[in-house]
Amino acid sequence: MALVEQLLGLGHRVATSGKDCQALDTLAAQHGSRLLRLPWQLHDEDQAASACLELCHAWGALDSLIINAGATDYLPDAVSATDVFETIVSSNQLAAEHCLGQAVPLLLKGEKPQVMAIFNRYSALQLYAPTRVTAGWNNTPQWFREARQSLKNQGIDLTVVAPHSLKTPVTSAMAFPEDWTPQSAAQELLQRLPLREPELVLEVTNLSSLWPLSR
């Protein structure tokens, strides 16, 4: 929500997928047609396609795609406590794959297109056998990294924002957890967005401050 609010404040047109809430209603009233609200169930392929179709009809092109790959909105009400983390990973993996697949044609029509995928400690976990080699099929950040060259060949830059990983480190520098708020994290990410860095390390002291558990 903070990313949407700050992008609108900077004068951008923003399309967002999120559950109906008072905060989005307020932003829509303030910014009118500059805010396009899309279906939120992006882990469902049909809903992701519907969102992309709405975006295509409204704008016809997309300059930047920012994927919140740590969302908890996709958790079903009946999910058991033991399955929460695996469901966060698998549902965000589906949403990310659907979003990127649907959005590429629109990005190709955009100006200097780029993608930023943002992960937290939970959604960056490796599925199935954690001792196995990290690969795109069991780790969503790695799935994006494996897609980087293909995107680059099409003129699309990719930034992966994720916690530091001991198995697949992207930097030798230590990143210490910080007390990020939604506003400060959004401001930092938007400042880094134009730099088009391949990797950014985001360590958060309190995950629920940025990704509250939606249950």
Label every model-predicted segment.
Residues 1-15:
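Canonical Rossmann dinucleotide-binding motif of NAD(H)/NADP(H)-dependent dehydrogenases/reductases
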Residues 31-46:
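Rossmann-fold cofactor-recognition segment
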Residues 49, 70-86:
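Conserved mid-core segment of classical short-chain dehydrogenase/reductases
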Residues 58-59, 75, 102-111, 150:
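A short helix-coil junction within the Rossmann-fold of NAD(P)-dependent oxidoreductases
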Residues 100-101, 145:
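A short, exposed helix-loop element centered on a Lys and neighboring polar residues
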Residues 108, 113-153, 165:
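Catalytic loop of short-chain dehydrogenase/reductase
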Residues 154-156, 160-161, 172-215:
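C-terminal helical subdomain
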